[in-house]
Amino acid sequence: MAAWLVRMSAYAELHCLSNFSFQRGASSATELFARAARLGYRALAITDECSLAGIVRAWQAAREHQVQLIVGSEIRLEQGPKLVLLAEDLEGYQNLCRLITRGRRQADKGHYRLLREDLQQPLAGLLAIWLPNDHGDEQAAWLRERFPQRLWLGVELHRGADDDARLDKLLALASHLRLPPVACGDVHMHARGRRALQDCMTAIRNHLPVSEAGAYLFPNGERHLRTLEALQGIYPQALLAETLKIAERCRFDLEQLKYQYPRELVPAGHDPASWLRHLTEQGIARRWPNGASAKVRKQIERELELIAELGYESYFLTVQDIVAFARGRKILCQGRGSAANSAVCFALGITELDPDRTNLLFERFLSRERNEPPDIDVDFEHERREEVIQYVFTRYGRQRAALTAVVSTYHGAGAVRDVAKALGLPPEQVDVLANCCGRWSDQAPSAERLEEAGFDPQSPILRRVLALTDELIGFPRHLSQHPGGFVISEQPLDTLVPVENASMAERTVIQWDKDDLDAVGLLKVDVLALGMLSALRRSFDLIHALRGGKRLSIASIPSEDPATYEMISRADTIGVFQIESRAQMAMLPRLRPQKFYDLVIQVAIVRPGPIQGDMVHPYLRRRNGEEPVAYPSAELEEVFERTLGVPLFQEQVMELAIVAADYTPGEADELRRSMAAWKRHGGLEHHRERLTRGMLAKGYEADFAARIFEQIKGFGSYGFPESHAASFALLTYASSWLKRHEPAAFACALINSWPMGFYSPDQLLQDARRHALQTRPVDVRHSGWDCSLESFGQAQPAIRLGLRMIRGFREEDARRIEQVREAEPFLDVHDLGRRARLDARALELLADAGALRGLAGHRHKARWAVASVEPQLPLFAEGTAIEESTVSLPLPSRGEELLSDYALLGTTLGPHPLKLLRGQLKARRCRDSRELAKLGHGRPIRVAGLVVGRQRPQTASGITFITLEDEFGMVNVVVRHDLAERQRRPFLESRLLQVEGILESSGEVRHVIAGRLHDLTPLLTGLDVRSRDFH
């Protein structure tokens, strides 16, 4: 034994599941590899079941802790054996990816199905560990044929009462079948202490409480990484030594993956570099008809040289091809993010930021030192993005194109709900407990909140629920589909990563998260959806149909229009892109944008980075002349002049590091990435010494260097790229101009593009009416599916509500109404039902929505008329209506009309609900929104209104903005975190809210700082008014 103790200096665990096995493994790869390193393991195989979803994270953890990673997967064949497959080399890895892909593609999302015939494919490079059941001889013969000289019999012992007998039986079987036995741990957790969580996850996975899951639970906590000494006491020496022989054979590393971008876009006679240059030159001629400036030419040459050096030409060509397809289909699109720093992207038509008008920092997008590929995000109209997605699938085929996965992780409410169910709490308690987490929380509920909900925080069962919830938060829950991140490859994707079915038909998704792609050098194209692009395109269509002439576009909108900036400065921005939130609207009268770059700052300044870095107030004071503008040096003046000496953008931090601390551009980008990750992973402190040393060497004071570093930390993961803000500001200006000069078309387009933005159609229509726009009701004689414009010579046309406004009404019914109405107007309800082939449900919806007023009278009459319409059967399709005697029916009351409007349309063109309640609100001494302008700062006030939105910006103060609406306008309410905690029910659930507080007034900006909340929802008596909540 003593000799063996000397020899037993290492071990390789060959069967281990991480938490990426989704509710099986109870430890992360980081935890597993950290413990494996402490215990002296030589290697650790991550073998999640039919999945490589967590293998990139495992690879990173293995490198961090210097323990060899063996890439593998556990699989179970239908009516066949259970195997652990390990990749010996690159060929084995590729075969494993193909096998997992086949299993996943043959089953619904979240499942897999593998049969024996699926293992008939070549399996070279894969080692197999067989975990035998009762059909040993037959299975072994078949497996030996599939894995010649690459098959072992796995022996898994977990200190069970029958371990000795089990070991003897398995060794006898191995000898009989002439298979080498090997020790395996079937590891599900890094340490024994995770057993309770592992049991809980098993119960969750099987939809049972732990108390009823005994058949599925492990009998003890031995499925953890055990010490070498413990393993020696369990397994014979030969079985442990065999693990190291297998580990020695498994030399595959993810670094061996060679990813190539598609090359078929390059025509004959060109290579990717020459074709990219050709397209760029074409773009230069189009973008600058009179020739590009020397500055732009120099920038483009520098970019093309670096793109060629790093081998990314095909990537740029692919994005350009996708954008060209969209533009050819007249789908509005625009690149954003760091790609807007690229003059080549502008020339190719991918982005819209003219490098002649902006200060580009290309290294924010691409640099030699940066160990990650470029990332180009392109927004498309949200209603037409699917056309672009299907184009990509058609162009490259399912084998070479797939969407990126997003790892959905457990958050507070979901974790506490699943744990509480598993521990057997009654359903009603589970719901209350989950609600205690709050919709914005990523933590288990606090003791105070539990007490408020009627729980005893010291209860043993509750303490157990909370302890397990804390462990479960952050664990992967399932793979979901990225909104539009594509991976496209020259070779079949399943030679790089497994591919599985997405939840949506006609889509496939790789098993890796978008963040994993950068680590292994895979390039992603983001085909994203943006509702504002749909709204802008609809606006242009409506204006062109109404006024004729040359079609308006984003590029042709008059620039730097004073009337537009005057409207923005008044915070009259409901519906406007990026500056419609209450936080943005509160800032607008203070910043008062007067030119385009002011909008770039406005978009970026109401963000957690500038706020937490204490940059907002200094900038505003300097802008308003309340504080002198000072620069620590002339060279930094060039960096910060555009933001009055205050760093607001990521690019400025990078430029500061380059100019003031002698960072290379690539080092500066590494600083940016460290900023983005430090709150989650640390890693920023080493820049403190580097930055300080560099700044001191350049003559800057130590306290200035310390202050700059603290501001960088304040940016944290929230620092906003200037290029991103500028791309968004283009859309901000375009939507602002439309709201100012074509308000009817803009409002109509917003409603037709909904859901999008902060405001519901009801709030958009209320805003339109406050701007004196005429709105007309839904009417089958005039309405189409979409809302439309009707003009009779007025400066601004009226908005006719479309049939899409009627909740539950089918688009196909609306299209038939439009089609048959073009031939001949409807005579009455019977004629409508017959010619448009409407069933009783559709006619009843039209009657209840008031859409039959022109054919049958008010709602009561219309409902009576609908009741007399015979069902539309083919035999009677051309028959006549049954004559009904005239019946006298009373007019609906105003209250009835209001209730019906909101129930069917979600809005009303009649009196605002609060106009009907104003008498009761006056009795409660509630002021209306008009009166706020006449009251002084600091005055106690009481207001009430419909809750139309809750917004919680990611700021240090934890406040929430609640927007109230009455018949005259909006009231902005600021709710502190402590008040929201104390009055959670009215804060979260009220639809009609009364607020007692203090009026805060600064210039034209007014808020009510809430001191007490009262839920007046019962006054609405069934009115269905819904808020739009954001965080």
From Swiss-Prot:
Which NCBIfam families does the UniProt entry name for this protein?
Answer: polc, PRK05672.1
Keyword annotations of the record: Cytoplasm, DNA damage, DNA repair, DNA replication, DNA-directed DNA polymerase, Nucleotidyltransferase, Transferase
EC main class here is transferase
What Pfam families does the database record attribute to this sequence?
A: DNA_pol3_alpha (PF07733), DNA_pol3_finger (PF17657), HHH_6 (PF14579), PHP (PF02811), tRNA_anti-codon (PF01336)
Catalytic activity from the UniProt record: DNA(n) + a 2'-deoxyribonucleoside 5'-triphosphate = DNA(n+1) + diphosphate
User: Example GO biological process term?
Assistant: DNA repair
Q: Which Gene3D superfamilies match?
A: 1.10.150.870, Metal-dependent hydrolases (3.20.20.140)
Q: Which GO terms describe its molecular function?
A: 3'-5' exonuclease activity; DNA-directed DNA polymerase activity; nucleic acid binding
What EC number(s) is this enzyme filed under?
A: 2.7.7.7
The family annotation for this protein states: Belongs to the DNA polymerase type-C family. DnaE2 subfamily.
Write down the InterPro entries for this protein, in alphabetical order. Answer: DNA_pol3_alpha_NTPase_dom, DNA_pol3_finger, DnaE2, DnaE2/DnaE/PolC, DNAPol_HHH, NA-bd_OB_tRNA, PHP_dom, Pol/His_phosphatase_N
Tell me where it resides.
Answer: Cytoplasm
Taxonomic lineage is: Bacteria, Pseudomonadati, Pseudomonadota, Gammaproteobacteria, Pseudomonadales
Q: Name one GO cellular component term.
A: cytoplasm
Q: What is this protein called?
A: Error-prone DNA polymerase
The highest taxon in the source lineage is Bacteria
Its annotated function is as follows: DNA polymerase involved in damage-induced mutagenesis and translesion synthesis (TLS). It is not the major replicative DNA polymerase.
